[in-house]
Amino acid sequence: MSLAYKKFAALFVLVAGLCMGTFAQDKTEAINLFNQGVEQMKANDPNAVNTFEKVVAICDQIGDSAQDVKSKAITVIPDLYYKKAYNLLMTDKKVNESLQASKTTLAMADKYQDPNVKESTQKLMIQAYTSMAANYGQTKEYDKAVLACDSILAINPDHTPTLYNKALMLRGLDKGPEFEQTIDLYLSKIQGDAAKTEQANKVARDYFRVAGGKANKDNKLNDAVTLLTKASKYGEDNNLYYQFASVYNKQKKFELAATNAQKGLDMDAAATPENKAKYYYELGTAQAGLGKTSDACQSLTNAMYGPFLNAAKGQKTNLKCPQ
């Protein structure tokens, strides 16, 4: 509902009271025009705002004797601008047009010193930009979604839902540094909310773990360690430990590889033998590198499932493990 309507009844009574008094002739036009504006408001006529602005202009020409009429007019001008912006968004679903109207409303709220309309307009703009960001996200236009999120954060830097959504859009753009900065800022602002913190940590951990796994697959081992270390900043993950073990084995850092493979096993203790095979394979590889042949043979035996079967067999043959 428009804020103007909340003031309408009081205005109408005030105008009626003014008309019963004795006014100088030069106020007659302002009074009549004011009453016309009230009638236009009652009829939802969009010309009402122009009428009240004319009232203000006439009162400024008259001077002090018309300040009472002017003060009543300026109480509704920002509200009427807000009503237009509100209807464009909520009724007509015209996001861009509503945002343009909202910017004009903010200027009117500042001009006529109406903090309530300013606050309401900012909230309306946040709704509009949120809708815009969501639409861009659905069509995978993540760069435009980020710009919409930035517009919200320019209005309210502490709008945490937008910080989270911006992080997701940056993830979609694969902008690691910007994603990390945004998700870290979000986490700093939601301290105490365990559910949201856990959710955000998982998003960040998964992003950097997957990126680290890709670097590992591409044999970019230093990059992989950097990315996996970033992932570990956001909590423990059994698959993260597996990736660490794999990278460290390739780097021949067998102690670190064995430690991480064992951590993965410990976290995934309830997994099936097939799902444990990857940890055992990396553990066996590390143990072989450390010269712990007997332990390596046992671990590689436990790794003989699925995609690790042939590789584990090959290592056992090379180690001359008992059959």
Protein language model features and the residues they cover:
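Terminal, low-structured helical/coil segments at or just beyond the last alpha-helical repeat
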Residues: 210-222, 274, 281-285, 289-323
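Structural motif corresponding to the intra-repeat A-B loop/turn of tetratricopeptide repeats
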Residues: 43, 91-92, 132, 139, ...
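N-terminal leader/linker segments that initiate helical-solenoid repeat arrays
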Residues: 2, 21-96, 100, 323
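Residue-level recognition of tetratricopeptide repeat
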Residues: 29, 62, 112, 125, ...
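Flexible helix-coil transition and linker loops at the boundaries of alpha-helical arrays
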Residues: 59-74, 107-123, 188-201, 266-274
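Canonical tetratricopeptide repeat
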Residues: 69-72, 76, 83, 117, ...
